[in-house]
Amino acid sequence: DRSHERVQRREILIDSFGSVAGQVNALTVLDYGDHAFGLPARVSARSYVGSLGVLNIERMVDMSGPLQQKSVMTIEGFLKSRFAQEFPISFACNVTFEQNYGGIEGDSASMAELCAIISAVSNVPMRQNIGVTGSMNQFGEAQPVGGVSHKIEGFYRICADQGFTGDQGVIIPLANAENVVLREEVVQAIRQGKFNIWTVEHINDAIELLTGMPSGDRTDGQYPADSVYGKAME
């Protein structure tokens, strides 16, 4: 409750409306042993000229565990397979969990991190009214994560506090769909069209939901200019 009150007072910066380039709401769980609850975290990414690829700020300051570090290397593998087939990767991008002071472990935010990075490099805004959870492999396939019900309810509460718009909701891996057990209040909000749950099988699906644009299919070594990946290659 105190954490959500801090969001309401703007001490923790989370928005459930608008679109921003290089910023995604990742769904997380805070576990205090006898009590766990969901609270979204803002993942931000900033890109610039260079050839260093992804720079994980948490890793650089020893605030990330081995699973989180592995997830960032997985993201790098995916990015290089998409954008460095014919020439070396030609960007650098810092990615971090904003207002994180206790360390990060796990790979459940890797889809959110990848979306923030792609958004920063392409300068295509990401919807803030959608929270994201899900692990991914180097092929971009969405993988199931733990605590999905807590995560959904955590973002639902943020949306309820800030006001429903009808287009808010969460993205989760399809493999997690059978694990979702929600409070009746959340179930009713979904039935009434106030809140949504989208399931995805691939990171491309998440990118398209968050941007409203095609992610892009490569033809003859090029992505369409009007796609997210095409803009990332510009």
Show which residues each predicted segment covers:
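Peripheral, non-AAA+ core regions of ATP-driven protein-machinery
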Residues: 3-16, 20-25, 39-234
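Structured beta-strand/loop patches that form or line metal/cofactor-binding pockets in enzymes
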Residues: 22-34
